[in-house]
């Protein structure tokens, strides 16, 4: 296990080493952000089974260590995350604990604003850090895409971004599509939007199906279909919802984590050889209380867990300066205390993913919070 001090200090030499300049960013590399909306419980995902307070505070919510997927003598993955556990063993996943953004209150709306804009406080910044990341790369069409019904804040900004969400309706036939295209030809705005929509549909291809609601694995394959194309996007965001588990958490989280595992598996299968150049960040707006509540769930907390997954990831490690779960160690007598800034993790991962200067990347993505300047390299060279 690597602690925060090692994570931060080991890159002092890295900053002194020559870096590839901004204009030379490797655009065949791919970066995907999977957001867990609703405050995913990091203690239920990456389980600190060896902490003596864990089982006592979690009660019936505690995962039996005999069933958990043990990674070392301290942490285990939830038993639903078999695919991610395999990627960890293969050196293609790194796991981070006690992670938090600068936000310290407990509003989903405000916390997601901070997470997606890269600000220090809600509404300090108007555009999203992923859009600013796209602006650091050599310009190309179809540079970034959101897999969501509407464009998420993280991808809003000066750079044009596509969005795609599978429809529950049957596919329109080619004749109807042609008629609509002719109808919109005289309108500069609608014509452009329609062309973008048709291009997105074409990129989705046969994997999109047309049978309504897609499974997580199918969605992963559709997203991979976009990303794997030579002319496809290189930055993508996938929204997942349903992580706000105030009640019946044990069964709900088992389902949520199974879906996440299948989504990652779909991405890996669909990307094929492009998986080797792919980095996936999984993160949430904040964590949940250490102790279970009275309705079989947990309430809004502070620190949580995050993941970096992909063929490009220099994985097989857990990064955690573990604060402990004893009463004296908790934040506000209830929350896992954060020891690693999510902005530090994101900035370094993005710099590594696209071979950008780490200091400049941190300044562009997180201009107000000033994340730590250095860390060990997270991705393969």
Map each language-model feature to its residues:
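Feature for exported/extracytoplasmic and membrane-associated proteins, marking the mature portion
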Residues: 1-273, 291, 305-381
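Metal-dependent active-site segment of extracytoplasmic phospho-/sulfohydrolases and closely related
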Residues: 264, 268-295, 300
């Amino acid at each position: 296990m690597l602690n925060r001090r090692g994570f931060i200090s080991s890159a002092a030499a890295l900053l002194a080493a020559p870096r590839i300049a901004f204009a030379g960013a490797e655009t065949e590399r791919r970066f995907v952000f999977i957001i867990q909306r609703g405050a995913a419980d990091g203690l239920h995902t990456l389980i600190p089974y060896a902490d003596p307070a864990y089982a006592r505070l979690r009660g019936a919510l505690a995962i039996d260590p005999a069933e958990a997927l043990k990674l070392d003598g301290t942490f285990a993955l939830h038993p639903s995350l078999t695919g991610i556990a395999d990627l960890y063993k293969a050196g293609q996943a790194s796991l981070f604990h006690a992670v938090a953004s600068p936000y310290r209150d407990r509003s989903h709306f405000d916390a997601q604003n901070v997470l997606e804009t890269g600000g220090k406080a809600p509404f300090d910044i108007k555009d999203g850090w992923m859009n600013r990341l796209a602006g650091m790369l050599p310009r190309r069409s179809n540079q970034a895409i959101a897999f969501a019904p509407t464009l998420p804040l993280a991808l809003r900004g000066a750079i044009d971004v596509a969005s795609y969400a599978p429809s529950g309706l049957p596919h329109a036939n080619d004749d109807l599509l042609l008629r609509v295209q002719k109808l919109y030809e005289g309108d500069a705005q609608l014509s452009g939007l329609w062309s973008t929509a048709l291009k997105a549909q074409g990129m989705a291809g046969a994997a999109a199906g047309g049978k309504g609601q897609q499974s997580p694995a199918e969605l992963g394959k559709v997203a991979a279909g976009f990303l794997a194309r030579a002319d496809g996007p290189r930055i993508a965001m996938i929204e997942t919802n349903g992580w706000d588990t105030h009640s019946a958490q044990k069964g709900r989280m088992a389902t949520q984590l199974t879906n996440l595992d299948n989504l990652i598996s779909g991405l890996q299968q669909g990307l094929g050889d492009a998986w080797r150049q792919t980095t996936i960040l999984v993160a949430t707006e904040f964590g949940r209380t250490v102790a279970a509540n009275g309705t079989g769930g947990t309430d809004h907390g502070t620190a949580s867990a995050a993941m970096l997954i992909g063929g490009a990831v220099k994985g097989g490690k857990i990064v955690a300066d573990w604060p402990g779960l004893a009463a004296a160690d908790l934040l506000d007598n209830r929350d896992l205390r954060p020891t690693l800034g999510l902005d530090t993790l994101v900035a370094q991962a993005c710099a590594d993913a696209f071979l950008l200067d780490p200091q400049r990347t941190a300044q562009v993505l997180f201009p107000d919070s000033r994340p730590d300047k250095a860390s060990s390299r997270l991705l393969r060279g």
